[in-house]
Amino acid sequence: MEVRVSKAVRFSRYGGSEVLEVVEVDDRPPAQGEVRVRVVAAGINPGEIAIREGAMESVTPSRFSRGEGPEGEGSDFAGVIVEVGDRVDGVSVGDEVIGFSDWRSAQAESVTLPADHVIPKPHGVSWDVAGSLFVAGTTARACVDAVRIRRGDTVVVAGAAGGVGILATQLAVLGGAAVVATASKENHAFLESIGAIPVEYGKGLVDRIRRIVPDGVDAFIDTHGDGNVEAAVKLGVDRDRINTIIDWPARKKFGVRGEGMSTVAPRETLIELARLLANGELVLPIQATYPLDQVRAAYERQGKRHGLGKIVLEVTPAP
C-alpha cells in the first residue's frame, strides 16, 4: 500500500519560533470512528506560544519530553474530508468541516482524528474564520460562563481586541450585559461596532472605568494579564466573578477564577459558535494570514500581542 506524505509543523525542543519546522510526515489513514481531513486553514493562538516555550510543561507535557518524538502544533482547523473510517455516520468524503485536534496537530496539510471532532462548516463562514474558531471561541464561552453573566450586568472584558476578547465581548452583549472593553485606541471603533463601550488600557484604567460606569462593575474577564486582575479587585468586583485565562500568579494571589476552554463541551460549543457566525450574530476579524511555510513569521506576529482579531495559516487551497 502506497504511503501518502504531506507537510506539517513540528518542533523537537522548547524555544522561540526558530524551533518550528515544516516537515514531511506520513498521512495516517483513518481508523474505525475517524476521518482524515485536508486542512484549508488553521488558527494561531497565544497559548501555543507558552506551550512551545515550555512554560506549560507541567500541565501539557510535550511528546519529545516523554521520548515520543516531535511535537505537533495547533488545535484549530477547517478543511475538507478526504477519507472516512469504518463505523462513521453523518459525514462523507467532500464535506466541508470545522474541527479541533486534541493532539496539537492541526497545523498540517492533513489531519486524522475522531469523526466527532468535526462539525459542518456553514457556507456563510469564511475558511479563515472557520479555521481559527475553536480555541478562541470555546475559551470565550468558558469565560462568559465562568463569571455568570446576567441580563443587565456591567462586564469588563480586558484585552477585547484579541480573538478570545472579541468573542467574549459579543457573547456577553448577546447575554444582555453592558460591556466595557479595554483595547488600544485604534481598535475602539470596531469594539463600538459590536456593541461595547471601549476604554484605553494602561495606567489609570480603574479611574477611567469608574468614570464610564459609576454604578460599578458586576463581572470582569481578563484575557490579557498585565495587572487586570488587580484592577478588577480595585473596582470591587466579587472575586468569584473575576476570570483570568492568563495571569496565574494573580489568580492565586487574589483567589479569582481561572476557567478556560476545558470547562465547556467542545463539540456542542463549536456548533453554537458556528451557528452564531453564520447568522451574523458574531463576527471574528482576521488580522493576518500566512502560508504554512511562514509559520515562524505568523507566531512572531502573534507574540507581539497587538492587532485586531485572529492570525491564520492558509494551508492548502480552498475548494
Report the location of each language-model feature.
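A glycine-/small-residue-rich N-terminal strand-loop-strand element
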Residues: 77-102
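C-terminal hydrophobic helical "lid"/dimerization subdomain
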Residues: 2-4, 270-319
